[in-house]
Amino acid sequence: MSQAKLKVRLLSMTPEALAVIYAAFRQCYSPGYVGDLWPKLVGGQVDPAEQALFVADVMESGHLSPVEHVSFTFAVEGVSRALTHQLVRHRLASYSQQSQRYVNESGFEYVLPPQIAKIPEARKLFEEFMDRTAETYGRLRELLQDHGRKGAKANEDARFVLPQAAESKIVLTMNCRSLLHFFALRCCERAQWEIRAMAKEMLAICLKRLPVVFQHAGARCIGLGYCPEGERFTCGRYPLQSTSFQSGE
């Protein structure tokens, strides 16, 4: 058994992403048919810088629905089941997660929380529990197999003892608007540390591939200029909403 390490890889994104978003925005405000404009967009006859400027200006007004036409697909590994339980609550997305029924989890990797890792006694207790859990899981599989439950049938019952720390792998697809919402929530310091780390890696990829859409993405305070979380939960990076308004910012 060993500790898992977070890895995020972009598998694919909508081809001609900027042109798709530009065309969608143009269709909203143009009496013409953007299908006729498309060959010029993909043929380089409309300057990408001009497209990006137009998209940025319209997004600034709060019109975001056209960015939904572009999506990103990521492969993620080295995350815990605790993380994926949070992740799949973002409903406007598609997920394909490694199955604990069809995959034998003997010797499973696990995610060790940093705050536990800092305390020697806590780390020892945690790692010993992981070892005991792996032994129990393996023994349960053996007993189930001895009583006629083979392969996935043994896995599906033995998995009930697996912890939330157990490492998982998942493929997810989100459109740009869903990603903007995801980053607003999960890049915030209030977000759980593990999903925040994953969100920041995803954002770095999105920002590199489609900067015009994601240039202001991240925790909500970045776009707002103030912290909307209230005095109890603020991290102090930005002034509170009431403070910001009182100062006229």
Task: Please state what every model-predicted region is.
Residues 1-249:
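Family-specific signature for flavin-dependent thymidylate synthase
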